[in-house]
Amino acid sequence: MAPGSWFSPLLIAVVTLGLPQEAAATFPAMPLSNLFANAVLRAQHLHLLAAETYKEFERTYIPEDQRYTNKNSQAAFCYSETIPAPTGKDDAQQKSDMELLRFSLVLIQSWLTPVQYLSKVFTNNLVFGTSDRVFEKLKDLEEGIQALMRELEDRSPRGPQLLRPTYDKFDIHLRNEDALLKNYGLLSCFKKDLHKVETYLKVMKCRRFGESNCTI
């Protein structure tokens, strides 16, 4: 994992087990405010990467006169719309922190498999340099959200189990119009889902720590 990423729970457990009982009891944990700050930064970065890639793909492969039509087609339907996740800031404000974390985790995990195929689709480094970087960043964010859930789980009642939406793999046949539209739709959903995660995390962070310069 890259420097500056989330503390590994396994590493902390191993180190803690090797400490005397008194030292283990006082082993410093990352403050909740830092966990939220790190999660927001990672979500912002991923959302920006997704938005830039979507625009570049659109500019490269989708004729301008087809863009509006394609955005309103079935190819643009996102599986994440089948779960009761908030669609904006106002809706998110009505949900508890644990509910928002569960939605965020489901959205992140739904993309872990598809993004591993990006390098086979965009061999000219169109997407984020390499798909490995995207996968690693998603895993980082997944671990950060799970860390937040562990911190909050004793203080919030458990909600109903959410079914994880499943996205198809990106299609490698870019000369096929159907494949282009499929990938265009997937990138659109990736961008939308990461925007949702970013919004949820910002709502939680602002609600808990009330920064005067808080923007969502």
Swiss-Prot record:
Subcellular locations according to the entry: Secreted
PROSITE patterns, A to Z: SOMATOTROPIN_1, SOMATOTROPIN_2
A biological process from GO: regulation of defense response to virus by host
Domain of life: Eukaryota
Presence of the UniProt keyword Transferase in the record: no
Name by which UniProt lists this protein: Somatotropin
Family indicated by similarity: Belongs to the somatotropin/prolactin family.
The keyword Ribonucleoprotein is annotated on this UniProt entry: no
Residues noted as binding Zn(2+) in the record, renumbered to the chain: H45, E198
Covalent S-S links between cysteines: C78-C189, C206-C214
GO molecular function terms attached to this record: growth factor activity; growth hormone receptor binding; hormone activity; metal ion binding; receptor ligand activity
Function in brief: Growth hormone plays an important role in growth control.
One Pfam family this sequence matches: Hormone_1
Gene: GH
UniProt KW keywords: Disulfide bond, Hormone, Metal-binding, Secreted, Signal, Zinc
SUPFAM superfamilies xref list: 4-helical cytokines
Signal peptide: 1-25
Record's GO cellular component terms: extracellular space; nucleus; plasma membrane; secretory granule; trans-Golgi network
Organism: Gallus gallus (Chicken)
